[in-house]
């Protein structure tokens, strides 16, 4: 785990096959300072208190995993059409995300023999969300995105949970990321908007 990152189970935690397409735990290139800067910005965005206080994201370890997954998905969608440097940064950021998850599972005292199985499950959850959110976002379907967020963030809810506010923020965030230049992406300086 990179110095300066906090484990999933800690207060204000940074969470840290379909593929470990990104070469999970593979060799790094020379972008580490850029990657660390962008990763910190993304994890900070995922910890904005408004998500947990106003937009119905549970302030729990899994709630924060869900929020960071959403932020990572937004960044991945922005960089999918970027040049080589942007795609390399995205690859290393997703690697860092899963490394933090692995570290956090071990910090919680999970036995080494079960970590790979749990990692595989969490990776599957992440890529499942990537597909579900993309289906709604590609068609600008806010209601569909809100429904997908309810299924993933509140799978056991006994009463309806309104996730339209988070869905609306994700569309605003996607537009915000698209407005940022390739140079900003390559420098690891992309930002996400505050919750209105």
Question: Model segments located where?
Answer:
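Surface/interface-facing alpha-helical segments and adjacent flexible terminal/loop regions used
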Residues: 15-196
